Amino acid sequence: VWSGITTYQRTLQQAELRLKNQARLTAVLMHKELERKASFLSIAARDSAVLEATRKGSQMVETNQLHTLPIDRVETLFQQKRLVPFTSMLPSQLEKLPSLDGFPDLLLTERNGLNLLSSAPPNDAVQRDEAWWETARTRGEWVGSPQLDVSNNRVMIEMAQPVIDPE
């Protein structure tokens, strides 16, 4: 009986050690993947097509004074697509990006936080009141906590990178 208990305890300790090692390896690999994704977002945020799109989008928003309207009014104006109506050139410009790098969803806003383009239907038309958007704008990036995406039963981590126009 003592021998069986000792063997069981040793097996349990070995299993726990293997699990800890796998968790460490997973954490290292996830960190590297997040760094790679952040690097892609940083490069994409400096891409000439992205800069031009956000420049023109901001110009259109400001010319029409959309950035001065209350958020609920903007949401009402753009409730169907939740995107600022923009010229057809925007999606074709962004197709020039080398790849979406495995991101299931990308959202591009102009400098006032109004959506210009989204690869999936966004929940709302204005992002400037969202903590993640403000954090990315002020700190230079934002990485959210892992969450379960119930639509595909996968864990997702949201990331944001501001587009800073050098002009």
Question: What kind of region is each of these model predictions?
Answer:
Residues 25, 36, 89-92, 128:
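Short, conserved clusters of charged catalytic residues that mark active-site
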